[in-house]
Amino acid sequence: MINKLYIATDSTESFRFNIVDSTDLVQSVRDIHNTSATASAALGRLSTMAAIMSHELKNESHNITLNLQGNGQGGMLISTVNGRGEVKSYVSHPEVDLPTKSNKKLDVGSFVGNEGLLTVIKDFKLKEPYIGQTSLVSGEIAEDFSNYFYQSDQRPTVVALGVLVDTDLSIKSAGGLFIQALPGFDESLIDKLESDINKFPPISSLFVTHDDPFDILNQYFSDFDLKLLGQKEVQYLCDCNRDRVERSLISLGKETLTELIEEDGKAELVCDFCNKKYNFSKEELMELRDNI
C-alpha cells in the first residue's frame, strides 16, 4: 500500500509543513520484521521520519539513511529512503518488548536508549555523502530529531511521530508531522505557531479519525493560510536484488569464497530489510570466485 507525504507552506512562506499518514508503511514494517509492540512503535517512528525527509530528494537515485545506535535493548535501528519515496528499515532485536510506561504508552525511549548517537547520511551522488551526527536526547525519536535539526540547521523545528499499535499487534494508525522555519522567517509568528502546536493532539490518534492529512494541517493551523506545495508517494519497498547480493559475495574475495565452497558447498544470504533469501549452489559460488 502507498501512503502520501503532503508538503505545504504558510502565506508568508515562513514555515514548511510536512505531514504523512504512514499507517500502511508501518504495517509493512510490522509484517516483514514481525516486530513486538514496542519495536513496531520505535521502528515505525524512524520509518515515518525517513518518509518525511524524502522531500529533500530530487533525484530517484539519491537516498537518506537514518541510524539510531543507543544503549537500549532494541539495539541498532536503521531506515533508508530513496528519491522514489521507497522506505526500508531494520532493527537488531525486533522481538524485544518492554512494559508500558505509567501513562500506558509504549516505552520507545527505553527500547532505543537515551545514550548514543543519531546519524543522518545524505547521499546525493556527489564525491562524498553528507554525514550529520548528534547525541540522543531521550530515545523517543521525535525529540532526538528535533534536536538534530536544531543543531544542524540552526532553525526552529518541530517533529511529531506516532504509532498506535492495536491489541493484535497490527498497526491501528501511524503518522508524522514536521514543521521547520524557512530562511528569513517572520519571527513574530513563532508564538502563534507554538500556541497551535500546544493544542495539537497525539499525532497517531489523528489518523484514526481523519482520512486527509492536509485537512489536519488546515484544522490545527488555520491561522497560517496554508497552501499545498506538493505530494509524494511513500511506501515500504526494499530494492535488494540478486545482482547486488552477488556483488556482496564477490567482495568477500577469492580466499573467503573458496573456504565457503569447501566447507559448506553452498550459501544462503538473507536481506536485513525484507528477509528475502538468496541461495547459491556450489557451482554458482565457484563461478563467482573464478570471475574475480
Swiss-Prot record:
Classification via InterPro entries: Heat_shock_Hsp33, Heat_shock_Hsp33_C, Heat_shock_Hsp33_N
GO biological process: protein refolding
GO cellular component: cytoplasm
Record keywords: Chaperone, Cytoplasm, Disulfide bond, Redox-active center, Stress response, Zinc
Domain of life: Bacteria
Xref: Pfam families: HSP33
Disulphide linkage map: 238-240, 271-274
Main location: cytoplasm
Processing after translation: Under oxidizing conditions two disulfide bonds are formed involving the reactive cysteines. Under reducing conditions zinc is bound to the reactive cysteines and the protein is inactive.
Function: Redox regulated molecular chaperone. Protects both thermally unfolding and oxidatively damaged proteins from irreversible aggregation. Plays an important role in the bacterial defense system toward oxidative stress.
HAMAP family xrefs: HslO (MF_00117)
Protein name according to UniProt: 33 kDa chaperonin
Annotated organism of origin: Finegoldia magna (strain ATCC 29328 / DSM 20472 / WAL 2508)
